[in-house]
């Protein structure tokens, strides 16, 4: 975005002098800071921020950042590597300075220039990253650095990350915007801004989530500021929901709307027009659709055939996007319309989703686009007036009068299913009445099922050999199929074997022999696995085995962690069924087994355990259904109690009686 503002030479000189004087000077550390070995305000912390200062000035097109960090452990030394992302071609990272101060007061300055790395490139736009490493860092050191980003002819209103990965003692944030766009500003002005669509921008908007008792101050000098102290680090707990939407931060942006209602009415309408333009039903699309469907096809037949066709294309989010020169050599062009993606037989997830939208409409189906915030990243917040918070495009069909949500941009996702990231996700959607807010349906546990079926031969010493089949549908199957797109099958087997280590008992090796249904998203994915090793504890007369062959180690944190600050996010509900059959040799019989049991958590989850005894076999079946996705902190004790009861049930023992001496069995007597 550019300004129609021309600065005089004197203004340029003034700009340079103000920028130089705005740089924060390095501070003399106190004796307490130098000798600090731990921080009572942040027990166990690897490092803490002593100071942060971030100053942005849009009229002068610059921002500065300054930080002082106390390193308290070896891990804290990682903060000596500083990365500064920036947009090449318009922005410059300048005036980088830094130093390391040892606990004895010795100062080691930063020398040399930062490395300049290319992060990504799309078309003519390149994102770079300046990287520098503060020297001679030790546990106990203070790291101090600053840098400036010059915005050239662009403006870039700031986003302040008030809450960070480490405790912050004090921080100061300051932003000077264009006064012409301040609330209440009026009167004629020759200055204006254009957004990416060429529209005039006339309002400054901000979104703030601050610690209790703190507020964004508008100062008499025409700048905003926030001063904070003792900011806790970003929470870090197992199974946390994405918390980006809940962190302490402040975002500023210039927009043409003054309130959320006006903003989304305008932006959603423009988004819908852009979608329709890309998904235009051109001659190429109509001919392609005609070759894929038949006149006698039902609406569902058409929808499925077209879905299979776009899923078969090269999704460059899972492979590699062709460069501009490659497209030129192949006489292709950047995708601006659905027909471009079809001609290229490739596209990213967004392009493929909108290609499906175009083809569905061309086939006579009622189809609308919906764009949502990925649940792996955050939640949709209409009060945050920024269309960029939306991530992924889905397609909502009406088939025989019933709504069907599909996820064509999610490679290997079956028709009628969506990635867990897109279930229960909010955003905007098209409709016959025009665009508006919407939330996708949540998933059910029946959408995601795993069955483990093991057949095991065991001897009196607990040595086992056997086979295991793991059959999955839903999200776990989708995960492994997408992984198979990026690596070969040998590497996939290694990764799957690694995942098995978390569920089989210690002393047992599990190795994948082969997969079935790996390339067919509509099939059950099966992994055929060999088992060998030793389980249980053996004596001369008995063999003691764990009641549950498979362990739920992934949930042990719920058992051991007494308190919870954040919600528990399971990602998606699912059902797990297990059947383990032990084949017993002559001379071994079942002496004792746990009683059949159920552990319910009303409305949320249920656990079931059952044993079946036959003369030469013992079969243990186990089931866990988690019918919830999110548990609030006030529900944590109920959740913890459920998994404690599950752990107690799993830790029971199967008792096998040995009626013949092991030595005789070994000789076959």
Roles of regions detected by a PLM:
Residues 1-5:
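Positively charged n-region of N-terminal signal peptides that target proteins for export
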Residues 22-669:
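A sensor for short, sequence-defined functional sites
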Residues 6-17:
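Bacterial N-terminal signal peptides
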């Amino acid at each position: 975005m550019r300004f129609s503002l021309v600065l005089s030479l004197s203004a340029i000189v003034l700009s340079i002098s103000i920028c130089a004087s705005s740089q924060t000077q390095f501070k003399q550390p106190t004796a307490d800071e130098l000798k600090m070995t731990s921080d009572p305000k942040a027990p166990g912390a690897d490092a803490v921020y002593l100071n942060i200062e971030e100053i942005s000035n849009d009229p002068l097109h610059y921002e500065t950042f300054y930080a002082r960090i106390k390193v308290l452990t070896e891990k804290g030394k990682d903060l000596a590597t500083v990365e500064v992302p920036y947009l090449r071609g318009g922005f410059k990272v300048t005036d980088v300075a830094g130093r390391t101060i040892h606990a004895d007061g010795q100062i080691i300055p930063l020398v040399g220039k930062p490395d300049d790395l290319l992060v990504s490139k799309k078309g003519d736009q390149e994102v770079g990253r300046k990287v520098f490493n503060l020297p001679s860092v030790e546990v106990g050191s203070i790291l101090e650095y600053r840098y400036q980003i010059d915005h050239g002819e662009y403006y870039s209103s700031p986003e302040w990350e008030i809450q960070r990965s480490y405790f912050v003692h004090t921080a100061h944030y300051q932003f000077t915007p264009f006064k012409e766009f301040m609330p209440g500003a009026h009167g004629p002005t020759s200055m204006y801004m254009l957004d990416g669509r060429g529209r005039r921008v006339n309002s400054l908007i901000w979104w703030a989530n601050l610690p209790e008792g703190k507020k964004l101050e508008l100062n008499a000098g025409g700048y905003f500021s926030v001063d904070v102290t003792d900011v806790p680090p970003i929470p870090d707990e197992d199974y946390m929901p994405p918390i980006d939407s809940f962190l302490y931060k402040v975002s500023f942006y210039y927009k043409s709307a003054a309130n959320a209602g006006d903003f989304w009415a305008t932006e959603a309408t423009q988004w819908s027009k852009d979608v329709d333009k890309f998904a235009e039903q051109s001659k190429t699309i109509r001919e392609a659709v005609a070759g894929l469907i038949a006149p006698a096809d039902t609406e569902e037949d058409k929808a499925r055939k077209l879905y299979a066709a776009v899923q078969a294309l090269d999704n460059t989010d899972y492979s590699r996007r062709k460069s501009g020169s490659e497209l030129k050599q192949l006489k292709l062009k950047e995708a601006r319309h659905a027909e471009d993606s079809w001609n290229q037989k490739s596209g990213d997830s967004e392009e493929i989703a909108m290609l499906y939208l175009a083809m569905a409409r061309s086939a006579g189906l009622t189809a609308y686009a919906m764009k949502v915030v990925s649940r792996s990243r955050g939640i949709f917040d209409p009060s945050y007036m920024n269309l960029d918070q939306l991530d992924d495009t889905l397609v909502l069909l009406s088939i025989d009068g019933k709504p069907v949500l599909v996820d064509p941009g999610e490679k290997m996702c079956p028709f009628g299913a969506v990635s867990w990231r897109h279930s229960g996700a909010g955003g905007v959607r098209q409709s016959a009445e025009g665009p508006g807010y919407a939330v996708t349906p949540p998933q059910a546990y029946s959408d995601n099922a795993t069955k483990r079926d093991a057949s095991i031969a065991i001897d009196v010493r607990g040595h086992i050999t056997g086979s295991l089949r793991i059959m999955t549908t839903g999200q776990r199957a989708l995960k492994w199929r997408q992984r198979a797109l990026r690596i070969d099958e040998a590497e996939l087997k290694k990764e799957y074997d690694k995942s098995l280590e978390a569920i089989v008992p210690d002393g047992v090796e599990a190795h994948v022999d082969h997969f079935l249904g790996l390339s067919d998203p509509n099939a059950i994915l099966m992994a055929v696995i060999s088992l060998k090793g030793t389980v249980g504890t053996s004596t001369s007369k008995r063999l003691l085995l764990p009641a549950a062959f498979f362990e739920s180690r992934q949930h042990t944190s719920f058992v051991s962690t007494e308190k919870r600050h954040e919600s528990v996010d399971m990602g998606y509900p699912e059902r797990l069924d297990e059947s383990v059959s032990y084949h017993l040799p002559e001379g071994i019989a079942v002496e004792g087994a746990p009683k059949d049991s159920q552990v319910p958590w009303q409305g949320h989850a249920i656990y079931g355990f059952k044993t079946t005894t036959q003369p030469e076999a013992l079969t243990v079946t186990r089931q866990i259904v988690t019918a919830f996705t999110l548990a609030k902190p006030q529900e944590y004790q109920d959740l913890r109690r459920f998994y404690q009861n599950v752990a107690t049930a799993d830790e029971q023992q199967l008792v096998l009686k040995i009626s013949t001496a092991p030595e005789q069995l070994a000789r076959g007597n």
